[in-house]
Structures are given as C-alpha cells and as structure tokens.
C-alpha cells in the first residue's frame, strides 16, 4: 500500500492526529520549582456524549502557556455572496483534510468555497508522523524535527527499539503551503460557521451564522468530530482516546534526543499512589514524548482507548506523578493541549447528501487513533470523485453525485479493513496493563511490514488476517489465552458484520 500513498504525493495533505483541543490558563507557583496542583473534579460525561462540546477540566498545572493563538499573515480572496453564484464545491471546515480537497478540486478548474470561522488560524496541536508517510507526499520540508527511530518501554526491564524514523510537523508551514495552493487555484474563503444545510434537487444551500447563504452543487463536511452536518442513524458508542500534553522547557529529562518515545507503559511512578496505581492497572495510560533537545520536550500522557474515556483530571494526575518520578522539572510551558478522540463506532449513513471526510466520516483508525495515512489516501479519492461526477456528461442529481463520492470513499475493502480495526479496538478495551504490555510485546515483534502497515492503514483484509495469525503466534501463552478469552465475542461480531456488509 506504499504505492497508494505515493500516487497522491502532489496533494500535500496531513490530517491532524487530534480530537478536541482546548487551551487553559495555568496558575503560577510561588515556589522556585514548578510542580503541579489539581483542583476539584468535574464530570466529563456531557462532552463525551456531544463531540461538538470541547473538553473542560478544572485540574490545572501551575504554569501559564506562553504561546497564544496565531494566525497566518496571508490575504484571503473572500467569497462574494452578492453575486449569487452557485459554486461547484463548498468545503465546511478549514483543517488539513478540507484544504487538501479544496486544493485538488480547484486545481481541476472547478469553483470552490472554503467556509470556516477562523480560516487563518494555525492548527493548535502537535502532529507526529512516520517520516516515510511524509516522504511519500514530498512533504519532508514540512517536518521541523525528525528522530532516527522510536522506543517503546513495556516495563522497567523491557523496551523495544523501532527502526522507523519519526517526525514532528511544522503545522504553520504546512498550512501556509496548502493555503497558497488554494489561493493560486482560485478558492474563495468565507469566515463563518455553517448552521444549517437545505438540499434541493441539484444544489444545496448552506446557511451561515452571519446571515450569508452559500449555494453549492456538492457539500463536503470536513469539520472533524463535530458530527453536525453528516448524519448517523445507529447508536453512537465509540471508545475514546484521551490525552493531555505540554510543550515545555525543562531543567533536564532522561530521554535520548535521537529517539522519540512512542509509548512508555512503565508504572513505577505510581508505586506509592495506591488509588492511581489500581486505576492504571485496570485502564492504563502511557507517556508519548518528542525530545527536541536536552531541555525542550513535548510530553503527553495518553489513554489509548477506553469506554467511557478516562477523565482529563486523572490523565493529568498520572502525568504529574510520572514527571516527578522521572525527575522532570518543568520551567515553562510553550503550549498545552487536551485531546479527546472518538474511536470506532458506526459509520455515518451511506450514502447521504452531505459528503464527509476525516473524523466526521468515521475515518479515525479505531485501534490507534491515527488518521494520517488514511486521510492521505482519502482526500484525493474524494477530490477526484467530485471532479469526475461534476464533469460527467450524464446530468446527475445532487443525491446521485453524493452517493457516487461516498461509494469511492468507503469501498467494500475499506469497510472490511475498518471492521478488523474495530475488532482490534474491542480487544484493547478489555486488556489491563499487563495484558496491554503483552499485546505490544508481540505486536512490535512482527515483521516491520505488518506493524508499519497496521499503524498506517496500509493492510487490507487478506493481509490483516495474516497479521492477526502472526500476532497470535508471536504472543506468549498467557497472552494467547487472554486474546481467546477476551477476543472471541468481538471476533464473532466482526465476522457477522463482514458477512452482512456486501456490495
């Protein structure tokens, strides 16, 4: 599947590896050393039920992030509603996926309007990618830091070295490049929020919160996890990946600056914290770290997947204990981020009039939370499909065009792949800390082709079956018993869904 990525290298696309992020003010300590303090706890149930609501947390660190929201210095050609023109494509959402589709559709000579409440705002989160994925897109210049490989700490004694270079995206440069291509292709921008869409036979009316109505032949929802335009008709009960991260200046840290820390499952930092240790044994969290120097590092405590998600305050509390145990003293915080990523769950109604991409189209990797390789493949597929059907000699209705685009976005092989990934998520949901360690011990013992392909969504059902059998053969006897005991019901469900889902 490496060729699939390379086939679209001209697009210049990355979809963010994040769900909802929110910046919070952090209180300053009166002491010389900066430690962490937590306030009262609040329920997170409301924003897990409604992904349109951002994560809230009263738990705070003692430092104020220094970086403020930043906008690109670029002049945008704005949409003129007074002309009453019907554009070929309206893209709702100015994230990487939306801009990528806008870029390629406009390159084919079609008219595009990008609608976003903050079109110049630089994306807030730190994006990490495997270097080979960006190399396939000719986007290596958009990586501001690379590491020769990665390391996984399973416990105090066991670690895995991953011989696969990793990089951090320069999100400002990436957005600038994508915006420049959109502008040169004639994309128009409208700074507003879409609150309603009314569909007619051959066009749709997008009603914005500023009173403007944008008319378009096709509507693309690229708003992430909001689920505000794309419709679902099945109960929505995903797993949740929850993470809290900081980009910080520290006095020192113990990590090799030549390798990023992909996962650190060690729990010795909770030895004297019985309640946290018990919770971590049942639903574990790991540290993800990108060291830029001996004193500057991105640190993120992550719950891989849980249902319901681990409360943000608890994620922060575990992170505090870990950093203290590692002797990491934070001097200042450049940025902080809170992420909640819905994983798995049903696909949206297929087909439907509004086309989706990214999180709103169910494209998050259900086992890992990754979307990069998946969206790399999907953005040009969506764009090419839109160009093809809008330019068709046979006059298609709005419903017919959208149905064809959805069919290209979610062909049977992609739906089957997603079913397998959901099966993997269901197994991970049932594993405790020890089971998770055993699972990843076997996972990273696989041939690189298979764990690379699994993480980057490059394996399809025949290879995924071999992947599963290989993983089972690599696992310890204890892990095999555990997989059989906890994976039988999810396996039966997966097989049933595969049988029912036919073209």
Feature annotation, model-predicted:
Residues 65-114:
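N-terminal Rossmann-like FAD-binding beta1-loop-alpha1 element of flavoenzymes
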Residues 104, 108, 181-332, 342-350, ...:
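Predominantly flavin-linked oxidoreductase catalytic cores and closely associated redox partners
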Residues 307-337, 377-404:
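Flavin-binding catalytic cores
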Residues 100-156:
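N-terminal FAD cofactor-binding segment of flavoenzymes
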Residues 284, 338-357, 411-419, 428-433:
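FAD-binding beta-loop-beta segment adjacent to the flavin cofactor pocket
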Residues 1-46, 52:
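N-terminal chloroplast transit peptides
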Residues 380-503:
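Long, low-complexity C-terminal extensions of enzymes
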Residues 362-383:
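A conserved FAD-binding loop/helix module that cradles the flavin
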């Amino acid at each position: 599947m490496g060729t699939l990525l390379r086939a679209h290298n001209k697009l210049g696309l990355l979809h963010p590896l994040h769900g909802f992020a929110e910046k919070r003010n952090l209180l300053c300590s009166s002491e010389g050393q900066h430690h962490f303090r937590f306030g009262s706890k609040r329920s997170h149930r409301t924003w897990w039920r409604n992904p349109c609501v951002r994560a809230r947390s009263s738990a705070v660190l003692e430092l104020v992030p220094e970086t403020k929201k930043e906008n690109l210095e670029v002049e945008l050609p704005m949409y003129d509603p007074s002309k009453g023109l019907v554009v070929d494509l309206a893209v709702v959402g100015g994230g990487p996926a939306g801009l990528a589709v806008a870029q390629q559709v406009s390159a084919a000579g079609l008219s595009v309007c990008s609608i976003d409440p903050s079109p110049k705002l630089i994306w807030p989160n730190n994006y990490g990618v495997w270097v080979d994925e960006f190399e396939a897109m000719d986007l290596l210049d958009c990586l501001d830091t690379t590491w020769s490989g990665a390391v996984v700490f399973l416990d105090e004694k066991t670690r895995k070295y991953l011989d696969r270079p990793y990089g951090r995206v320069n999100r400002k440069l990436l957005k600038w490049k994508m915006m420049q291509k959109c502008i040169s292709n004639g994309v128009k921008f409208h700074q507003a929020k879409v609150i309603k869409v009314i569909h007619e036979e051959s066009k749709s009316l997008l009603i914005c919160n500023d009173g403007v109505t944008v008319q378009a032949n096709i509507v693309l929802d690229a708003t992430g996890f909001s689920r505000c335009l794309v419709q679902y008709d099945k109960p929505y009960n995903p797993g949740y990946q929850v993470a809290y991260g900081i980009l910080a200046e520290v006095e020192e840290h113990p990590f090799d600056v030549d390798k990023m820390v992909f996962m650190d499952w060690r729990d010795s930092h909770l030895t004297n914290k019985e309640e946290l240790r018990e919770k971590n044994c049942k639903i574990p969290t790991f540290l993800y770290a990108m060291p830029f120097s001996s004193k500057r590092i991105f640190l993120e405590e992550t719950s891989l997947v849980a249902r319901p998600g681990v409360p943000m305050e608890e994620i922060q509390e575990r992170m505090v204990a870990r950093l203290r145990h590692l002797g990491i003293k934070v001097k200042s915080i450049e940025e902080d981020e809170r992420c909640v990523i819905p994983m798995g769950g049903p696909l949206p109604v297929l087909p439907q009039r509004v086309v989706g991409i990214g999180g709103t189209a169910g494209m998050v990797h259900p086992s890992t939370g990754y979307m990069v390789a998946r969206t790399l493949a999907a953005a040009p597929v969506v764009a090419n499909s839109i160009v093809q059907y809008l330019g068709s000699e046979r006059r298609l209705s709005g419903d017919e065009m959208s149905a064809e685009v959805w069919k290209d976005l979610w062909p049977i092989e992609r739906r089957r792949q997603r079913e397998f990934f959901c099966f993997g998520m269901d197994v991970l949901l049932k594993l405790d800390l020890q089971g998770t360690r055993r699972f990843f011990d076997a996972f990273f013992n696989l041939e690189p082709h298979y764990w690379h392909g699994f993480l980057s969504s490059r394996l399809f059902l025949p290879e995924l079956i071999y992947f599963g059998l290989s993983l089972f053969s690599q696992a310890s006897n204890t892990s095999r018993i555990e997989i059989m005991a906890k994976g039988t019901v999810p396996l039966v469900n997966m097989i049933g869904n595969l049988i029912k889902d036919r073209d």
